[in-house]
A protein has these predicted regions:
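Catalytic-core elements of nucleic-acid end-processing and repair enzymes
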Residues: 1-123
Length: 123
């Protein structure tokens, strides 16, 4: 799904967590069932239309087990919810703040690279 999202959002410096980019509608449905949230509804279509980015936050030791569902808008965390739309643990909130700063740096770097390419083409 959307390769440019993979390179932007997937890598993280976290020791305890993994960010998973869902690959299919079934991934969304499974996340919604396991975390008892609404991500299995219309979020798949919204993501395909680039209206939002959904990521699944996992504990590294349990990468296949639903933990938190995250909605991003660029480098901004729109929402990060645990099971049954509960507030995630404080350490997750801290991680998400660090993660959003990492994403902001990547976005700035991409923009600088695009600008450099435009300048090259113009010359």
């Amino acid at each position: 799904m959307l390769p440019e999202l993979r390179s932007l959002y997937m890598k993280t410096k976290a020791d305890d967590y993994l960010m998973i980019l869902p690959e299919s509608k079934e991934d969304f449905n499974r996340e919604g069932r396991e975390n008892h949230n609404c991500v299995g509804g219309s979020y798949f279509d919204k993501m395909l239309q680039r209206k939002c980015t959904i990521l699944f936050l996992r504990k590294k030791e349990e990468p296949d087990k639903a933990f938190c569902t995250v909605e991003m808008d660029g480098d901004r965390v729109v929402q990060c919810r645990a099971v049954r739309n509960s507030t995630p643990p404080e350490e997750v909130t801290d991680f998400m703040q660090r993660y959003s700063r990492e994403i902001a740096v990547r976005i700035r770097k991409r923009q600088q690279e695009k600008n450099a390419q435009r300048i090259k083409v113009a010359i």
